[in-house]
Regions:
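Extended interfacial segments that mediate partner engagement and assembly in macromolecular machines
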Residues: 2-13, 17-26
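Auxiliary Fe-S-binding modules of radical SAM enzymes
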Residues: 4-5, 11-14, 38-50, 64, ...
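Hydrophobic residues within beta-strands of alpha/beta enzymes
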Residues: 18-20, 52, 77-79, 145, ...
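Conserved glycine-rich "GG(E/T)P / GGGxP" loop and the immediately following alpha-helix
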Residues: 18-38, 124-129
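Short, ordered loop/turn segments at secondary-structure junctions
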Residues: 23-25, 57, 81-84, 149-150, ...
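A short acidic, helix-capping loop that chelates divalent metal ions and anchors anionic groups
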Residues: 24-29, 85-91, 153-159, 195
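Active-site-adjacent beta->alpha loops and helix N-cap segments on the catalytic face
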Residues: 27-39, 62, 86-87, 91-102
């Protein structure tokens, strides 16, 4: 089973911190929440000192599915907002910006673990829209924020509208920290699982 295979990988690699994620599984009745929970529970029961972060899809905002993830007691709860609301409809038509915020808020209110989210820049957003999104995330209870550069996978995909400079990433980090985030990673190649243990402080 996958939980057991994850356990073997953790033991072989002597890992102390893992991030479990997946693609959307809207084809499953619980959107994959039960499998997330089984993986977390198996790992934490067999490797007691292991810290586990989950990076989940929105699970369609289904509270029963979200609650199932919470009951497994991961150490960090993550769901990526990805982009600002105006651009969200274009680049993630299958998703919903407000639903993602509701997921993050549910994790924050109903769970005990810190909540984390990630956003990509370079999709045509404005600085004002980024600041507004940061505020939305704070109001949803997000503590940790990751900001990275959007890189188009290739032809036929949404194009990169802007490449941010290191100075601009530093500025966004400083803005986010001043607004109240506890930890912020803001770098061109940063992704939500990048330096996850350091961000979590575990």
């Amino acid at each position: 089973s996958e939980p057991f295979r994850l356990y073997l990988a953790v033991k072989e690699l002597s890992l102390k911190y893992v991030v479990i994620t997946s693609v959307d599984r809207d084809d499953l009745e619980d959107y994959g929440a039960g499998h997330y929970a089984k993986c977390v529970e198996f790992l934490k029961s067999h490797v007691p000192d292991l810290r586990v972060e989950v990076l989940t899809p929105d699970l369609r905002g289904d509270e029963r599915a979200l609650e199932r993830v919470l009951r497994a007691e991961p150490d960090v709860l993550a769901h990526n907002i990805e982009t600002v609301e105006r651009v969200f409809r274009v680049v993630r038509p299958q998703g919903d910006y407000r639903r993602s915020l509701r997921v993050l808020k549910f994790y924050s209110k109903e769970g005990s673990a810190p909540v984390k989210s990630g956003i990509m820049v370079g999709l045509g957003e404005t600085k004002e829209e980024l600041i507004s999104t940061f505020q939305d995330l704070l109001e949803a209870g997000v503590s940790y924020l990751v900001i990275g550069q959007y890189l188009s996978p290739g032809r036929g995909y949404y194009p990169v509208r802007k490449h941010y400079s290191k100075e601009e990433f530093d500025e966004l980090r400083d803005i986010a920290l001043s607004m109240g985030f506890k930890r912020v990673l803001s770098e061109p190649l940063a992704r939500s699982s990048y330096h996850a243990q350091e961000i979590a402080g575990l």
